[in-house]
Amino acid sequence: QTAVPTPAPGQVLLRTVYLSLDPYMRGRMSDAASYAASVAVGEPMVGATVCRVQSSQNEKFAVGDWVLAYTGWQDFAVSDGSGLTKLDPGMGSVSYALGVMGMPGFTAYMGLLDIGAPKAGETVVVAAATGAVGSVVGQIAKLKGCRVVGIAGGAEKCKSAMEDLGF
């Protein structure tokens, strides 16, 4: 437990409402060499968050604004505003910024369309089909006119892949 920080001039106080739990974070919990730096024991896990501005001394942000931040897994954080992206709750749930409209969605989009480049009528096989990336890959493939075969672990996930996602 730490005290809630007080923002200085030019800063905002953010309250974390949603945090992202992504597979790459497993590598951050190890001292082994990885593409993502490890997190020291006792420090907050690094990662994307959706936060609400609690107080502001920064003219670009008002109390109540929703932002995408990289403040890590902590209840409160102070930011000078750099690296924050305002979110419009009128465009859908702000939590989408951590999923379909965030890193998992971008990974699915670029991986499938830029690298996979599927064509209508082809079959796309998706591993981890009910996960954050796989479910989006399958949906994009369906939009491209592909037949999607989803692979998932266990009867419940397989049922969801078929009934909820249409794979």
Each language-model region and where it sits:
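NAD(P)H dinucleotide-binding glycine-rich loop of Rossmann-like/cofactor-binding domains
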Residues: 45-52, 60-128
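Short, surface-exposed, polar/charged, turn-prone segments marking secondary-structure boundaries
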Residues: 28-29, 34, 40-47, 95-96, ...
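Glycine-rich beta-strand-centered segment in the early N-terminal region that forms part
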Residues: 2-21, 29-73
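Short, glycine/acidic-enriched capping/hinge loops at junctions between secondary-structure elements
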Residues: 25-29, 132
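Mid-domain Rossmann-like dinucleotide-binding core that forms the NAD(H)/NADP(H) cofactor-binding site
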Residues: 98-167
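A short, hydrophobic/aromatic-rich structural module that often spans a beta strand
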Residues: 26-27, 69-73, 138, 160
